[in-house]
Amino acid sequence: MSSGAASGTGRGRPRGGGPGPGDPPPSETHKLVVVGGGGVGKSALTIQFIQSYFVSDYDPTIEDSYTKICSVDGIPARLDILDTAGQEEFGAMREQYMRAGHGFLLVFAINDRQSFNEVGKLFTQILRVKDRDDFPVVLVGNKADLESQRQVPRSEASAFGASHHVAYFEASAKLRLNVDEAFEQLVRAVRKYQEQELPPSPPSAPRKKGGGCPCVLL
């Protein structure tokens, strides 16, 4: 479970405070990027996770950044979260933030078929920019509170996640459903990936017993 302090740079949005005096210092920093098509609720998910606040009316995001210090699986972590633009006119910015990200929350809306089609393209772009066959990604079907308007079957989204080896969550920023869980799973995926990417430690040189010149007894 996540807990901790948060702050944000989004314009006209509530801000959190810094870490309290009793909070343990974070032992790691992760750069997380929230990506997806326009209007899928990326900002709503991010702000709900950062500040436990649902924003229903705001201008389309160009790019906002937030910081949250929290504990995931008992390990303090600083999360630098970039909430990105979904509008096509800002597409040129994508590769820049993709290069910097340690992990990606890939978001579509369950009531928007086109947004689901878009995540496949974004996933492919992430792997191309990173020049990897896999990378830490969590797939999120947002707006689960709009079940009656669903256009993307849960089974189809789950199959996408399974075939690409990424976790899938159906979430609702409005109801705060699976919001923390999705971000926490992304942190776990980043940790696992980084552990696998670390070069093996060089073997330590064997210690010689004794020292100095050999003694000769006369």
Curated annotation (Swiss-Prot):
<keyword id="KW-1003">Cell membrane</keyword>
<keyword id="KW-0564">Palmitate</keyword>
<dbReference type="GO" id="GO:0045766">
    <property type="term" value="P:positive regulation of angiogenesis"/>
</dbReference>
<keyword id="KW-0472">Membrane</keyword>
<dbReference type="GO" id="GO:0051896">
    <property type="term" value="P:regulation of phosphatidylinositol 3-kinase/protein kinase B signal transduction"/>
</dbReference>
<feature type="lipid moiety-binding region" description="S-geranylgeranyl cysteine">
    <location>
        <position position="215"/>
    </location>
</feature>
<comment type="function">
    <text>GTP-binding protein with GTPase activity, likely involved in the regulation of MAPK signaling pathway and thereby controlling multiple cellular processes. Regulates the organization of the actin cytoskeleton. With OSPBL3, modulates integrin beta-1 (ITGB1) activity.</text>
</comment>
<dbReference type="GO" id="GO:0005525">
    <property type="term" value="F:GTP binding"/>
</dbReference>
<keyword id="KW-0342">GTP-binding</keyword>
<dbReference type="Pfam" id="PF00071">
    <property type="entry name" value="Ras"/>
</dbReference>
<dbReference type="GO" id="GO:0003924">
    <property type="term" value="F:GTPase activity"/>
</dbReference>
<dbReference type="GO" id="GO:1904906">
    <property type="term" value="P:positive regulation of endothelial cell-matrix adhesion via fibronectin"/>
</dbReference>
<dbReference type="InterPro" id="IPR027417">
    <property type="entry name" value="P-loop_NTPase"/>
</dbReference>
<feature type="binding site">
    <location>
        <begin position="172"/>
        <end position="174"/>
    </location>
    <ligand>
        <name>GTP</name>
    </ligand>
</feature>
<feature type="modified residue" description="Cysteine methyl ester">
    <location>
        <position position="215"/>
    </location>
</feature>
<feature type="binding site">
    <location>
        <begin position="36"/>
        <end position="44"/>
    </location>
    <ligand>
        <name>GTP</name>
    </ligand>
</feature>
<dbReference type="GO" id="GO:0070372">
    <property type="term" value="P:regulation of ERK1 and ERK2 cascade"/>
</dbReference>
<protein>
    <recommendedName>
        <fullName>Ras-related protein R-Ras</fullName>
        <ecNumber>3.6.5.2</ecNumber>
    </recommendedName>
</protein>
<dbReference type="GO" id="GO:0002521">
    <property type="term" value="P:leukocyte differentiation"/>
</dbReference>
<feature type="compositionally biased region" description="Gly residues">
    <location>
        <begin position="7"/>
        <end position="20"/>
    </location>
</feature>
<dbReference type="GO" id="GO:0044877">
    <property type="term" value="F:protein-containing complex binding"/>
</dbReference>
<dbReference type="GO" id="GO:0036135">
    <property type="term" value="P:Schwann cell migration"/>
</dbReference>
<dbReference type="InterPro" id="IPR001806">
    <property type="entry name" value="Small_GTPase"/>
</dbReference>
<keyword id="KW-0547">Nucleotide-binding</keyword>
<comment type="subunit">
    <text>Interacts with PLCE1. Interacts (active GTP-bound form preferentially) with RGS14. Interacts with OSBPL3. Interacts with ZDHHC19.</text>
</comment>
<dbReference type="GO" id="GO:2001214">
    <property type="term" value="P:positive regulation of vasculogenesis"/>
</dbReference>
<keyword id="KW-0488">Methylation</keyword>
<dbReference type="GO" id="GO:0005925">
    <property type="term" value="C:focal adhesion"/>
</dbReference>
<feature type="propeptide" description="Removed in mature form">
    <location>
        <begin position="216"/>
        <end position="218"/>
    </location>
</feature>
<comment type="similarity">
    <text>Belongs to the small GTPase superfamily. Ras family.</text>
</comment>
<feature type="binding site">
    <location>
        <begin position="83"/>
        <end position="87"/>
    </location>
    <ligand>
        <name>GTP</name>
    </ligand>
</feature>
<dbReference type="InterPro" id="IPR020849">
    <property type="entry name" value="Small_GTPase_Ras-type"/>
</dbReference>
<dbReference type="GO" id="GO:1900148">
    <property type="term" value="P:negative regulation of Schwann cell migration"/>
</dbReference>
<keyword id="KW-0636">Prenylation</keyword>
<dbReference type="GO" id="GO:0005886">
    <property type="term" value="C:plasma membrane"/>
</dbReference>
<feature type="binding site">
    <location>
        <begin position="142"/>
        <end position="145"/>
    </location>
    <ligand>
        <name>GTP</name>
    </ligand>
</feature>
<dbReference type="GO" id="GO:0019003">
    <property type="term" value="F:GDP binding"/>
</dbReference>
<feature type="region of interest" description="Disordered">
    <location>
        <begin position="1"/>
        <end position="30"/>
    </location>
</feature>
<keyword id="KW-0449">Lipoprotein</keyword>
<keyword id="KW-0378">Hydrolase</keyword>
<feature type="short sequence motif" description="Effector region">
    <location>
        <begin position="58"/>
        <end position="66"/>
    </location>
</feature>
<dbReference type="GO" id="GO:0007265">
    <property type="term" value="P:Ras protein signal transduction"/>
</dbReference>
